[in-house]
Each structure stands twice: as C-alpha cells, then as structure tokens.
Amino acid sequence: MDLIAFKNVKSKFLLMALLGYECPICGEIYIKRKSMITHLRKHNTNLKLSNCRRISLRTGEYIEIKTEEE
C-alpha cells in the first residue's frame, strides 16, 4: 500500500505522523484524533473511536493497539 493512496492525508503531516485512524464504514483515513471523532459523528452516532482501526502511515499495515487479557 503506497502512501500516495491516502487521498485525505496532507503531505505536511505525513512526515510527522506515524499512525492514522481508519473509518470502519467508508475506509477514509484521518491523522488527527479530533477529526476522526468529528467524522464518526457525521456517519453514525453509535460508532466510537475504539471501533476504528489504527494504520501505519509509513508501511500501510494495520496496528493492533488493544492488549489481550489472559
């Protein structure tokens, strides 16, 4: 997955940001937490930030943040 594929990621943030949020409905990627929360409010009020997947902007891989309970 190329970094160029992210249409809504601005180039000045690309160098600073390591992780982004991916919307579970439309697949758009946001760097800032606040912009992702605003996007989720417009889509569906039942969605929470914890439903979003984190994605590495450098490699394009999904990052698992939640810790597993044993």
UniProtKB/Swiss-Prot annotation:
Key word RNA-binding present: no
An annotated Gene Ontology molecular function: zinc ion binding
PROSITE patterns, sorted: ZINC_FINGER_C2H2_1, ZINC_FINGER_C2H2_2
Keywords, comma-separated and alphabetical: Metal-binding, Zinc, Zinc-finger
Zinc finger (C2H2-type): 21-43
InterPro entries referenced in this protein's UniProt entry, alphabetically: Znf_C2H2_sf (IPR036236), Znf_C2H2_type (IPR013087)
Protein name: Uncharacterized zinc finger protein 70
Annotated organism of origin: Sulfolobus islandicus rod-shaped virus 1
